[in-house]
Amino acid sequence: MRLVIIFLIISVIYGQPKYNHPELDWYSFETEHFKIHYHDDAESSAREAATVAEHIYDNVTSFYDYEPKEKTHIVLKDTDDYSNGAAYYYDNKIVIWASPLNFELRGSHRWLQNVITHEFVHIISLQKSMKMGTKIPGAYFQYMGYEEEKRKDVLYGYPNMLVSYPIPGTSVPPWLAEGIAQYMYDEASWDTWDTHRDMILRDRTINNNLLSFDQISTFGKKGIGNESTYNTGYALSRYISYKYGSIALKNIIIELSNPLQYSVNDAIHNVLDIDGYHLYDDFKSTLKERYKKLTNLVE
């Protein structure tokens, strides 16, 4: 009985990881393309968010030639001393913490304009890349093997083999997802390549500490490693746009939507006629040459 009580207590603790603020009253309104949800004292932020979202809608959707089938939900929260945004692209929902972000590793940008555009690009680009639509996030092929039956009254023998092969519904690596979300669209000015970002990339370049192509395809790093995935992805997306045209970013996403395409390396090759690893080598060589010239001026 004691173990049952302990189990129930632990279940309650881990089942309530976030306080849901039951004291708040929530409100909603709709615009042409969005459903906006906000709570007490956040109406001004919600109204501004709606204006921003409608302003950037055509730019983002035309860049990727894709529109959501339904209105996108935007939830505005201002309950914590915290700033962030999240895109739930299978749910067609964006959550925004309204407080402006003061992030030392990036320059100063207008918060709501920046974060709403960033997250909406996630919604559009990742939905564009889906192989099976928003209703099927993935699938598994499984095979189970069994020992030979030893008794006539037993239908199956003891299971001795399990083969499971996951089939993801999206296969966009972090560097590309975050890189194009920071790039946003042609002529976008809410987020820019600022001196803070350049400092991080320059330091890694001149100290031969750039992340590898495989490393920028995952998160889970220490220190500024995760930020460097954002940073390098943004720089690489800008490089692709400059060298091959911004349409290449959309075409890579389209290629990754192919049900049989699960390699960004091959997707890049099919679009740019150069595989991802060689593209990244060219990108690194360009960075080294550029920063060598710049640092020679101050030596």
Task: Identify the meaning behind each predicted range.
Residues 3-12:
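Sec-dependent N-terminal signal peptides
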Residues 4, 16, 24, 219-220:
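Alpha-helical interaction segments
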Residues 16-166:
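Juxtacatalytic substrate-recognition/specificity segment
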Residues 21-22, 91-93, 111-115, 123, ...:
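Acidic/His/Gly-enriched intrinsically disordered linker/tail segments
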